[in-house]
């Protein structure tokens, strides 16, 4: 049970620290408003998948490219901030769950509208 608790604590800590690094340390004017929505860790804690959402949907690919190009920098910043034995390798991915949530909301509104018309 203990490794699970450690992994959960590390996941929360990495989410906060990566968000802080993106906000204050990565100085790329092409980056817009980015939210770190989740972090998934591999079982051995060596790989961290960082899920992000971007305010402007047209900037998704560019944002992912910039962040994935800066993942070495993010890793070095994490190494400076945290005292952990293994610093995970980062992979940035777009969080599709937000889009799915909007789509489900749209479908529910359409169903409600259709049922009211009948």
From Swiss-Prot:
Keyword line: Cytoplasm, Ribosome biogenesis
UniProt subcellular location: Cytoplasm
Keyword ATP-binding: no
Transmembrane segments: none
GO CC, one annotated term: cytosol
Key word Transferase present: no
Chief place of localization: cytoplasm
GO terms of molecular function: ribosomal small subunit binding
GO BP of this protein: maturation of SSU-rRNA; ribosome biogenesis
Gene3D superfamilies in UniProt: 3.30.300.20
Family designation: Belongs to the RbfA family.
Described function: One of several proteins that assist in the late maturation steps of the functional core of the 30S ribosomal subunit. Associates with free 30S ribosomal subunits (but not with 30S subunits that are part of 70S ribosomes or polysomes). Required for efficient processing of 16S rRNA. May interact with the 5'-terminal helix region of 16S rRNA.
Subunit organization: Monomer. Binds 30S ribosomal subunits, but not 50S ribosomal subunits or 70S ribosomes.
Protein name per its UniProtKB record: Ribosome-binding factor A
Natural source organism: Thermodesulfovibrio yellowstonii (strain ATCC 51303 / DSM 11347 / YP87)
Lineage summary: Bacteria, Pseudomonadati, Nitrospirota, Thermodesulfovibrionia, Thermodesulfovibrionales
């Amino acid at each position: 049970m203990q490794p699970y608790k450690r992994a959960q604590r590390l996941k929360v800590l990495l989410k906060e620290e990566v968000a802080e690094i993106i906000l204050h340390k990565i100085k790329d004017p092409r980056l817009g408003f980015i939210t770190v929505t989740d972090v998934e860790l591999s079982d051995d804690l060596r790989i961290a998948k960082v899920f992000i959402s971007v305010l402007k949907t047209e900037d998704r690919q560019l944002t992912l490219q910039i962040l994935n190009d800066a993942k070495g920098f993010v890793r070095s910043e994490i190494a400076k901030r945290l005292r952990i034995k293994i610093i995970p390798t980062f992979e940035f991915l777009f969080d599709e769950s937000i889009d799915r949530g909007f789509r489900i909301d749209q479908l529910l509104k359409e169903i409600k509208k259709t049922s009211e018309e009948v």
